Amino acid sequence: PENYIQRVIQFAKQGFKEIEFKTYDTDWDSEAYLTVSGQNSNNSIRVTNEFLEKVEKNEDWNLLRRTDGKVFKTLKAKDLWSKITEAAWSCADPGLQYDSTINEWHTCPKEEKINASNPCSEYMFIDDTACNLASLNLIKFSLGDKSFNVDAFEYACRLWTLTLEISVMMAQFPSKEIAQKSFDYRTLGLGYANIGGLLMSWGVPYDSNEGRSICASITAIMTGISYATSAEIAKELGAFSKYKINSKDMLRVIKNHKRAAEGFEDGYDSLTINPVPLIKEDCSITELPKAASLAWKKAYELGSKYGFRNAQTTVIAPTGTIGLVMDCDTTGIEPDFAMVKFKKLAGGGYFKIINQVVPQALKNLDYDINQINDIKQYVLGSGSLKNCQSVSHSALKDKGFEKEQLDLIENSLESAFDIKFVFNQFTLGEDFCKNILKISDTQLNDFSFDMLNFLGFTKEEIDAANIHVCGSMTLEGAPHLKD
């Protein structure tokens, strides 16, 4: 690391000839994790339209002191933008919030500006407010054959909007101010998870016009139905207490949403940058954009008549924790980050799982059951050296392995990341390694010692055995794949 290099240079200048550096391992309970700062924080920065315009023109941007508002430093906006994007690409921080756009879509601008969000950045509203979250697992509304149960999804959105509205009265907040303002604005946090899993199960690429259109349609249905339900509740119980002074702005925002759901590229009210509209032609499931348009038409009509019970109704949270409990393959709006996951168990050990929608996706892409099983084994591996052509049982017997050692190896392979981690003195026993395999103490205690290589297996043979046992961890290169 760069800081270590600088330390060495400084020590050398001071005349030090020997420097001792502390080393760490990667165990999740080790000291190494304690040295990594920022583990319990999410870092986001806000950029305005003015900043983005200066990036385009390669103009100067002033950094201001928070204490007195005076200029601290002036630099090129484009250079700062490059640093921000490189940092976000390499470590996912900082997150970006587009301040001008956020406040142009603010439903209650007469009160306060939206200054910040919650840590995960899905909830954008005024200071000292909060919302309760609820997420729907989208794959539960799939009918399995690239069709979506719109009626059931709309019903679930209505039901959960009502449930979250009730929860405003029951929620416990960390301060009096947050409790009061959350009661006044009654913001809700309905969202969804597993859009990546849903698209994959249908064989639709996540990064495609079709995938984006399906996602946009489902999102528009959820938010439109939720606002329409909020207006229905307002008819019975009244609008939220701050609605009257914000009604004109809120209806403007709802109308802009409606226009986007209807697919218009222009005609928006008080927006500097128009949204990307819903492109109906890209959506292969024709009832989705139709339902989205109707949902927002209903939301605007009912809201114009009765107002809204809630200042906001939906968010899309990362669902990193609840998504696992909900049996989701992917969290929030994200794609799947890997075909295979190793889940570490708190009691020790691991288990390996493949994304459970992969077989369904292959079926929808017209692969037969035998092809699907072959592809699954290629990805996950067999968890055994049986039928392996390179590091086989017979080859190991020729090296001195008996049934006892082969059984020990087999019992350890199922959860192994790499077969080399199984071939060690802790699995096979120190006596066997020394007396039968003739491995020295120095070699056994060397962390980099490769027993399979010592036994005479080539790199190609070891790699082939690894794929056979542990899998390739990816679909790339799998048998039977079509172009």
Residue ranges: model-predicted function:
Residues 1-483:
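Long, C-terminal-biased catalytic regions of enzyme "large/alpha" subunits
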